[in-house]
Amino acid sequence: MTKETHENHLRTHNGIFPVSLLSTQARQLLNFKLKSPSYYLLNSFKLLVKSEGNNQSTTADVTLTKSPNAYHASSAREEKDLQVSRRDTCFYCSRKIIKCICNEEHVGIESVQLKLILLLCQNLPNVTTNAKKYFSSLADGHNFTLTLYKFSLDNQTFSQLLSRFKSFATLTELLQVHNVMLQVNFSFQARQLNTEIQLRRCHSLEKTWKFLFGDYELPDVLKDMESSNSDWSDTSLKRIAYLCSLVEELKLHSSIMNDKYVCLVSKHNNALEDKFNSEAARQLLQKSLSIVASNLKQAENKTISYEEKLSIAQNSINEIQTQNRDLKLETEKLQDQIKALLERNQSLQEALETVKNDEKNLREMNANYETEMKEARQKLNNKEALISHYDDDFRAKELKISRLSESLREKAGLLEFQSSVSEQRDLLYQEQIQSSIKDMENVFRKNEYLMEELNELKNNLEVESSKVLRLDEEMKCLKDEQLSQFDTVFSLTDERDGLQKDLKNTKGNLDDEIGRSAFLKSQIRDQELTIEKLHDSLETLSQTNNSLQCEISEKNAELNSVNSKLSEGRAHLETANKENEILKQQLELSESKLASLLNSYQSFINKKEHLYSFLQLVEPSFAKSDSSNATESQISESVRKGISIFNLLFIVYKNVCSQAGINPSTKLEDLDEHTLSDELTYITKKFVQKDQEYQTKEIELRNYKITLQSLLEDKLIGVNTDCRSPSCSDFEQLGQESENNTSISGRVSKLVKSFNDSSSISNNTKISITKSPSGEKVSVFKEMSDIALRDMDKNRKLLGENVDVRNIVVQKDESLNIDLQNNAVVPELHFKEGMVYDSLENAYTYLAESKRMLANELQMKQEDLEKVILELEAYKEIFLEEKQIPCEEFMPGKNAKSEKSLRSVFQEQLMRETKRVRKLEKVNSELKLHCFELSERLREREHTLQQTFGDK
């Protein structure tokens, strides 16, 4: 066969032998593209044995050769016995194959591990020691890396080649080798696939192959295939069914091949006895066989250890797959959380913008409030002047009342003197009556004069009867002069008694008024005590405000710590991003390295001609019984070429080790199965570790993002507020608007707008109140002033605190401007001991309620002030109506008027005094009621304050 025809033969059939030599099973196996890499090694082995035999004039290879006739006859018989209908469709794609049975277009298995070589060594126990040594050195030199060349023979042709050797054992051993080939090919395919479904599929296929060709039975395999939930296609099931049938056929043919093997061995032994009678050849053969046996034992030990390592690696791969599934589920959950956090973040940004707008409105309201305060101060000064004027009037009226009491005492003394005079007159009248009885004549004479006096007395009595009913009734009864005289005497006595009673009543009323004034003073003192208690409670409130400031400072420190943690999280995120970029670069480098490996593979294929020339030299040794025409120089050159090819493979092994970060062994002799298997497992583990690191870095990056957003979400709320003491109108508007607006941002903005320093009390009234006006009745002003001052201090403190918090928020907004735009962080608000508010809204509602209560109380105090002013005006009217009565008329030393005139004057004075006393009693009763109402209000206020602070 020439070189050109041989190349064409290889190009068309991808094999060294014609297709007619192959059986149907061989053709079917060729459809899998599962070719044995050991053909070249066997040829080199046979050549080596032949070269040794030529040097010693007897070789083991001569015994394995046949005559041409026997060779052709055996091949023809095998073809007749084993030929079955051809399968001309591809097993993988189910398409018809036109050009070749094993077209590379349909099946893309590019490589197989070199474990097959060692297994072949195990299954050839009778090979010479030198050949096996060379064989194992080549296998060790290639490691368990991927072989980068196409194979040319299938299992059947390989069995035909081995049938020419005495060292051929059984076909079952070759089937074991073929099983290993299938396992290796499927494991390599699993590494090349990317998606999870394909990985599972290849894993299950690999498992079924183990069951098919291992120690398991066939029905278990089918059960496992049916029970498994892997995504297998119809083509894969067809393949497995076909392979099962193929295994059965191979078992049948193995018995036939064993029979043929017995015949061949007998023939070969006869040929050996005829042609090799020399002792040198036998010794050489024994040495080679002993060496091969020792090497086979070592190879068996190595394969056992390697299989154990493979089982450990498969367990680790299964664990990694379960971990990957869990990680994918966790990543999906984290992505959902990230979406929810982003939505909440947007709502917080909107709330912060509304708060900033409210802050601008508050500044404008503060400016208006300052102008209103100036006007209110002027009004308060004017009212203070009026109150001082009323105070002076009140003092003047008190002096007048004292003078009146003195004048009344003097009048009482005069009335007593007049009563004594009237008694003396009564005695004189009695003497006159007795004298008149004795002296009737004189009486009749004087009767006319007396009648005139009686008429005058009647007129006077008629005037007096309109004022005093008793005197009118008694005066009507007087008809006669005597009776009139007696009646006058009795009426004067009655008048004296009535005047005495009236004096006693006036004294009692004055004493009652003094007691009432003392009672009022005691009530005013009680009010002052309650006001002092209120001051104490307000002082406790100020202390709580100080504690609030301390807590706010602590919260600011916590904010700083949170910000430091956030900065650390950002640094971790940056490092994670950098590491991800590095991993991506490493993946790109690995891809580039794979491309370079493919290039080296293609370059190695280009050097395949050396192998072809090597095989051409080997082929005549099988075709001819006599020694081949090849010279020793040609054989040595072909061997050198084969060795150079394997050296090239060793170079590829070094490149792979360098890319995987392993220090390769520099000598072929130093390579063991253990070291090579360890290096292979290390490469796979390193690749898996890199993949896991990349996935963990992605998960860490997502976790950092989630933690950052959760921290921001938990602490983000807009704090841009100013506090003031609102007026009642503001609170009423706020209540109406809060009912209409239900959104949180709207309510917060309305509350913020209501907190100005503008209140219903003007600044002037506050300043006048602080001056503590004189008098015990004006103690209400002290209470109002203290409340107003405390309220202003509270508002100032809260304003300062809100400004500090707002500055902190602005700084944090500038620093946290990565993913969240203009968000602010707020601590929890602490008011009073044991009162914690989770949000500004609750705090503002509490402040609004307290300020409403204070505003209502201030309005009540203003109403009380107006009432007091009205009472002062009533006192003024009373004292203006008062007229001082001249006491000269009642002096005993001067000529007094007549009794009638005196009576009329006294009656008028008594009527005026009674009217004044009644007015004073009314004013007194009103003051008592007012004081009682004030005390009840103060008690209610204390009760409400105790309830609110106790509950909180």
UniProtKB/Swiss-Prot annotation:
It comes from the Eukaryota. Keywords: Coiled coil, Cytoplasm, Meiosis. The keyword Glycosyltransferase does not apply. Residues 283-611, 684-716, 839-942 form a coiled coil. The keyword Coiled coil applies. It is found in: Cytoplasm. GO terms for biological process: meiotic cell cycle. GO terms for cellular component: cytoplasm. Has a role in meiosis. This is Meiotic coiled-coil protein 3. It comes from Schizosaccharomyces pombe (strain 972 / ATCC 24843) (Fission yeast).
